[in-house]
Amino acid sequence: MAERTHACGRVTVEAIGQTVQLKGWVQKRRDLGGLIFIDLRDRTGIVQVVFSPETSKEALEVAETIRGEYVLHVEGTVVARGAGAINENMATGQIEVQATKVTVLNAAKTTPIIIADDTDASEDVRLKYRYLDLRRPVMYNTFKMRHDVTKTIRNFLDTEEFLEVETPILTKSTPEGARDYLVPSRVHDGEFYALPQSPQLFKQLLMVGGFERYYQVARCFRDEDLRADRQPEFTQIDIEASFLTQEEILDMMERMMTKVMKDVKGVEISVPFPRMTYADAMARYGSDKPDTRFEMELTDLSEFAAGCGFKVFTGAVENGGQVKAINAKGAASKYSRKDIDALTEFVKVYGAKGLAWLKVEEDGLKGPIAKFFNEEEANVIMTTLEASAGDLLLFVADKKSVVADSLGALRLRLGKELELIDENKFNFLWVTDWPLLEYDEEANRYFAAHHPFTMPFREDVELLETAPEKARAQAYDLVLNGYELGGGSLRIYERDVQEKMFKALGFTQEEAREQFGFLLEAFEYGTPPHGGIALGLDRLVMLLAGRTNLRDTIAFPKTASASCLLTDAPSPVAGAQLEELHLKLNVKE
């Protein structure tokens, strides 16, 4: 078999007159009365191949048997297309290849999906036949971008003197965070490894080990409820460094992302990135990962609501809640009563009891709650919300957390429905000054807002014992277009502070030592101050590639139920395997 001389998408006018050897798949076959045209595709693109009796009767006879997705080896001569046949939409549109010889390397059945960017297949079919789905150019280009992003990050970190170090996949189960994926040990009866949710502890131990600058393109595993931007196994760019301040870490990450955007997308972004405290983000956007590509911020009307004539508003404030609103500028005519009812049902999903609304007309406020406000109160609403004729005002009165969640989600929905979001924008943002702990009323205990190894502000360390809810974290999240791209923090590196943190989380001394004794002991041997960040590679590529589903950036992803339609994983295993592992199943019928 002759070697390939050209990739299909790279045969250009410079090759006119040359004999070329091409290999690829049949994208399309057209029979035009004695002539057969085949679009031959490989990873680089498509080239048109012409079979004619004048050039080769033998090749034409073979071409008559060829169908879509056959794998071919074509030998032929590159010629210029006629003036009327030039296709400006193809990189190879000025030439075609006159086939002198063709070999079928492999035949193909009719594929269950159309191999094209615009396929008609459902996602389940695409995942079942993922190897065919990956042939679509849009998929190849996505994974080429993923490769380019990873390569750019590796090169950047190499220039910053970081070492790429692999950490264990089989590790110890720890109780914090999501559920672990467990792996039974055959050698140690009744004991289990866990797949890592992140390399957090090992990268900190590398800092104890004096490596100073570490990174890893790390595989992580979390047994949690899935959604469109979550997968049970995912990849993160894991970074840790000793002796760097928070400012130095943020600056380095900004330089890294600037290089990624320029090298991969050809987009210049400005630095430093805007910063917003966690409290400010929640107050203004109802989200700890605000999408700042459009306005429509939340406005607090609680002070006004406390003394107004609408009892729903006053009652919410009296019960310790708040009243907030968003102004959908110019949207009054775009939302009917039925449409607003749909918005009401939408906010109920986030815990809101309802959605109050007003439309602004030339002669004042109109809507079911307008009658509860006198002229002065109506003017306060108009002024506070900067409202004018044609605006739609939407209110939620409830607990603070419900108001933030429901209006934050409603803001995003309206931004999409009203086409306020510039899809070509890349708005990076740091969210800083997070609460260290979050209280779970059902569990009746505190949980770490990020993880148990996050350093509190120095002046807040004592609050761990007196008022844990007031302690602030030296933590920072990188947000891009409303998605959390990554989270990081300075880490605890002193044993006494770490023990105070464990105590605030409800660990007894014995539990802390049993779970994390190796880390606590390591902190007694000269641990340097350190910190880092972990960036979600899958999510970053999703955003840069303009995809809406994380599964499109993972070669062989799982479904929303954490199953693989291609391999039928997870699946039962033989009884002998379970016996070797000393396991008995207690499966509910």
Swiss-Prot record:
Record-level Gene Ontology MF annotations: aspartate-tRNA ligase activity; aspartate-tRNA(Asn) ligase activity; ATP binding; catalytic activity, acting on a protein; nucleic acid binding; transferase activity
Region feature (Aspartate): 200-203
The gene coding this protein: aspS
Lineage, top ranks: Bacteria, Bacillati, Bacillota, Bacilli, Bacillales
Residue(s) at site: Important for tRNA non-discrimination: G84
Function comment: Aspartyl-tRNA synthetase with relaxed tRNA specificity since it is able to aspartylate not only its cognate tRNA(Asp) but also tRNA(Asn). Reaction proceeds in two steps: L-aspartate is first activated by ATP to form Asp-AMP and then transferred to the acceptor end of tRNA(Asp/Asn).
GO cellular component terms given for this protein: cytoplasm
Matching PROSITE patterns: AA_TRNA_LIGASE_II
Entry's localization field: Cytoplasm
Binding-site residues, ATP: R222, D223, E224, Q231, E484, G536, L537, D538, R539
Catalytic activity, as annotated: tRNA(Asx) + L-aspartate + ATP = L-aspartyl-tRNA(Asx) + AMP + diphosphate
Keyword Cell inner membrane: no
The keyword Nucleotide-binding is assigned to this record: yes
Sequence positions that bind L-aspartate: E176, R222, H450, R491
Principal location class: cytoplasm
EC nos: 6.1.1.23
Protein name, UniProt field: Aspartate--tRNA(Asp/Asn) ligase
Subunit composition and interactions: Homodimer.
Record family assignment: Belongs to the class-II aminoacyl-tRNA synthetase family. Type 1 subfamily.
GO biological process per UniProt: aspartyl-tRNA aminoacylation
Keywords, ordered alphabetically: Aminoacyl-tRNA synthetase, ATP-binding, Cytoplasm, Ligase, Nucleotide-binding, Protein biosynthesis
HAMAP family attached to this UniProt entry: Asp_tRNA_synth_type1
InterPro entries referenced in this protein's UniProt entry, alphabetically: Aa-tRNA-synt_II, aa-tRNA-synth_II, aa-tRNA-synth_II/BPL/LPL, Asp-tRNA-ligase_1, Asp-tRNA-ligase_1_N, Asp/Asn-tRNA-synth_IIb, AspRS_core, GAD-like_sf
Source organism of this protein record: Bacillus cytotoxicus (strain DSM 22905 / CIP 110041 / 391-98 / NVH 391-98)
